[in-house]
Amino acid sequence: MVKRNQRKKSAPKKRLTKAEVEKQRAIKRMILSVLMALLLIFAMLRLGVFGVTTYNMIRFLVGSLAYPFMFAWLIYLFCFKWLRQKDGMIAGVVIAFLGLLVEWHAFLFAMPRMLDQDIFLGTARLITRDLLALRVTEFVGGGMLGALLYKPIAFLFSNIGSYFIGFLFILLGLFLMTPWDIYDVSHFVKEAVDKLAVAYQENKEKRFIKREEHRLQAEKEALEKQAQEEEKRLAELTVDPETGEIVEDSQSQVSYDLAEDMTKEPEILAYDSHLKDDEASLFDQEDLAYAHEEIGAYDSLSALASSEDEMDMDEPVEVDFTPKTHLLYKLPTIDLFAPDKPKNQSKEKNLVRKNIKVLEDTFQSFGIDVKVERAEIGPSVTKYEIKPAVGVRVNRISNLADDLALALAAKDVRIEAPIPGKSLIGIEVPNSEIATVSFRELWEQSDANPENLLEVPLGKAVNGNARSFNLARMPHLLVAGSTGSGKSVAVNGIISSILMKARPDQVKFMMIDPKMVELSVYNDIPHLLIPVVTNPRKASKALQKVVDEMENRYELFSKIGVRNIAGYNTKVEEFNASSEQKQIPLTLIVVIVDELADLMMVASKEVEDAIIRLGQKARAAGIHMILATQRPSVDVISGLIKANVPSRMAFAVSSGTDSRTILDENGAEKLLGRGDMLFKPIDENHPVRLQGSFISDDDVERIVNFIKDQAEADYDDAFDPGEVSDNDPGFSGNGGAAEGDPLFEEAKALVLETQKASASMIQRRLSVGFNRATRLMDELEEAGVIGPAEGTKPRKVLQTN
């Protein structure tokens, strides 16, 4: 019995669980917090000797800031869990409080009675006097802690400089307490500067318009006064009562002036983008009609050629120099678009700090030593830039995309290994809330040059900067992505950007829209060469018309002696400056195909040939293409098309195969499908992730209606594809003829030479589609060259070579 009791006494105590230990700590923390709160309350209320003494002891530490110090301490005791979740809140309060201590102590030692006293001894003497007398009467500045901070600052910067240092501490503390970071502040400052610049430019334009109105009004009054004087002078002339003729000598002078005016060359009105619609009333009726009069065509180019090299022209090139629009044209303004809505990404900033810890822990669990250098919050994704340790292979990190997505609870993760131009690896994680980038916001923040008519703001990068591209440098663009990924919105944004900068006599469009709903809103704008083409059979002919225009322009360039459209237009300007006969510069042409796959199904051979020829030669002629498709497969985007359309824009696709078809690399399958894209221009080896701008249908209709009010559409018959029918020879599913295939003789010669007949051989040797090859086999059978099909056996060749 004794042994059993001894065994029980010597048994080890049961170890507490982690939850029980945490519970005991919480109880101790609560008891300590309550006791500390009671102590602070007694001190704040100065209850009795204990309260006054405690208050003076706190004053000894922080001086006359004892009340704010105790109040902040009480908040920390009961809200410390909430404060720990707010990163930077505690540090901000501490730094701001230190700044206040410096300010209070600088104020104390600016008093006359403290000027000659030692900082530490003078402060201690004031506090000790109240402490021993059990009273609170003296202003003691920032206490001993304030004296400790103030002494070196006052020694280095003087008493006045201490005020500035303390103020900087307070500003820094307030900045840390807010959810903003330095990038938000710089972005806010940049936006404020941009808005001030825009307001200044608008005021400058308004002042210019007012000056022009006053000038035009003065000219009008002067002309009216001159006309009245002339009418009065003519009324005073002597008229022969028999013949009714003027017998004064002024008759000859008047006749001479009229004759001189009739032979004078019309003056081309200079374009003024500030001219308002209501200013037309400032012109006389004759002047207004004269300003809207179209300039006559200058048929022969011999004068221009002789002014340069006096070269001979064997055959005159027919080029229409007649302007198709009136010269009084006002460009649209950004006010036509809906204003930008405010965005709040403070939630993302709190999430970023958490994700940085998760990323480092996840890599550590896989035995990879990395450090997150920085994080950039974009509109749709946040990019974490990590630096691997020496000896860590890049593919070890890139292979962890799925594991990182699991750890971060993200939809998908895209890894950019490495970031071009940096010794870092980028990890792009989708944001919890996508911030929409409006077209107006992107336009106002972009730094596009208004002189570059084809420079278009495309979207925002991950760092929040607006990115623009110049279609003239691309020189052609392929846009591909699945349905609903933002492809059509991006095309509308490109068109709207060009319409915002270019007049109809500067840029022309040819739009091809087999779906009949995407681009039909642009019908009847003056920038169109022909109405929007919706018939796929007409589209191939329309593209051929553009090819013919390209050839005509090159023939013109060769005879004038220039290499591109810029050189030709420069020659025209020089010729117009020295000659009374004016010529019109050539316009840029932008060809937009909204659904390339539909055209390739109807007339693949003709469409592909036209696209390839334009891709090879059209840049110097001022012709550029934008090809869009929602089926990025190799039978739509062939190798020749990709070789001649070097700039690519990939939206979200379903597989890595489609991404490789567009960009020649993976990545587009990781996109969100919310207007984000991978843009790979001609001058970059790696794609750039951008968040495209959103432009609503209402915005498009407003800008289209504004342009239609400026001028009417004047289509060019030279680009009209004419009428086509379903039985039109030359159109078939693969580009072959419906009857009497032109490759029949070649196919017959091939079969007779090889004494073999199969659709696959014809398809391979003649480079045709399978459907066309089977039709050629049927024609060979009807012509008696080969026998009928016998199941799996090869066909017999009935003729010999």
Curated annotation (Swiss-Prot):
Residue ranges that the UniProt entry lists as topological domain Cytoplasmic: 178-801
Listed transmembrane segments: 31-53, 58-80, 89-111, 131-150, 155-177
Listed SUPFAM superfamilies: P-loop containing nucleoside triphosphate hydrolases, Winged helix' DNA-binding domain
PROSITE patterns attached to this UniProt entry: FTSK (PS50901)
One GO MF term: DNA binding
Record-level GO BP terms: cell division; chromosome segregation
Coarse class of the protein's main subcellular location: membrane
Cellular component aspect of the GO annotation: plasma membrane
Annotated ranges, domain FtsK: 464-660
UniProt subcellular location: Cell membrane
Membrane topology classification: Multi-pass membrane protein
Record key words, sorted: ATP-binding, Cell cycle, Cell division, Cell membrane, Chromosome partition, DNA-binding, Membrane, Nucleotide-binding, Transmembrane, Transmembrane helix
Annotated Pfam families: FtsK_alpha, FtsK_gamma, FtsK_SpoIIIE
Record carries keyword DNA repair: no
Keyword Cell cycle: yes
Disordered: annotated segments: 720-739
Residues annotated to bind ATP: 484-489
Entry's free-text remark on domains: Consists of an N-terminal domain, which is sufficient for the localization to the septal ring and is required for cell division, followed by a linker domain, and a C-terminal domain, which forms the translocation motor involved in chromosome segregation. The C-terminal domain can be further subdivided into alpha, beta and gamma subdomains. The alpha and beta subdomains form the DNA pump, and the gamma subdomain is a regulatory subdomain.
Subunit description: Homohexamer. Forms a ring that surrounds DNA.
Family to which this protein belongs: Belongs to the FtsK/SpoIIIE/SftA family.
Function: Essential cell division protein that coordinates cell division and chromosome segregation. The N-terminus is involved in assembly of the cell-division machinery. The C-terminus functions as a DNA motor that moves dsDNA in an ATP-dependent manner towards the difSL recombination site, which is located within the replication terminus region. Required for activation of the XerS recombinase, allowing activation of chromosome unlinking by recombination.
Protein's name according to its UniProt entry: DNA translocase FtsK
Organism: Streptococcus pyogenes serotype M6 (strain ATCC BAA-946 / MGAS10394)
